[in-house]
Amino acid sequence: MTCSVTSFFTASALGVGNAETLANYRLGRAPGMKELAGDIPGRSIWFGSVPGELPEIAERDQDMRSNRLLKLAVESEPAFAALVAKYGADRVGIVLGASNTGIDEAEGFVDAWIETGAKPEKMDFSMIELGTPALYLKGLLGAKGPVYTVSTACSSATKAFGAARRLIAAGICDAVVTGGVDGRCRFAMNGFQALGALSPGSKPTSRRLLRHIQSQAQTPVGIQDVSLSRHGVARR
């Protein structure tokens, strides 16, 4: 059995959409890279965010950056919804990789709770459940096959692809929408800071990297905000 990638969408610091991402990559340009202060006490860091505005979400308990990215992907690439029409809702699964989904929003709510002494009205604990992004995408597409999130830190999205292929190989699904979606949060930033894994100049492939992080060239995978790739993996 052979699986093939039939469609995909990406949004990152390089831009929104496949064409813009490729064009900026070729030019060596990343419009979403900015120096930010406040996440880590006493220092600023270079960080990659998706440039531009993201679609709004009316549902209070679903309104977080990772879900807005998923909505952007579905609105930008109709081929994902077409998988459900082609194979039937019961034969389309969803497997996403995510680690920090909803954490940034939760941090803001907790700060407000501590400051005011009252739980914020918009705060919903389901926002930090790891399964939330996959369930939200299920609602957007109307898929009724297996739906879950893989959360194994930086390897999450890669493992999601493997899980998607196994669902197809086992005959459980004819198509799976898979990939990775995540957002920035202080929790993750301070974790990488504690490991000494953040480069002051944010040049992961430069020969001028500080010695203690030369062996961690892939570290920026962990510090790139809202890196997202949606792929429809279909059975031939």
Task: Give, region by region, the residue ranges found by the protein language model.
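Conserved "HGTGT" condensation-loop signature of ketosynthase/thiolase-family condensing enzymes
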Residues: 1-146, 185, 191-236
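Short secondary-structure boundary segments
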Residues: 180-181
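Glycine- and other small-residue-rich loops at beta-strand/loop junctions that grip anionic moieties
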Residues: 126, 150-153
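Short conserved active-site loop signatures built around small residues
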Residues: 157
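Active-site histidine-anchored catalytic micro-motif
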Residues: 160
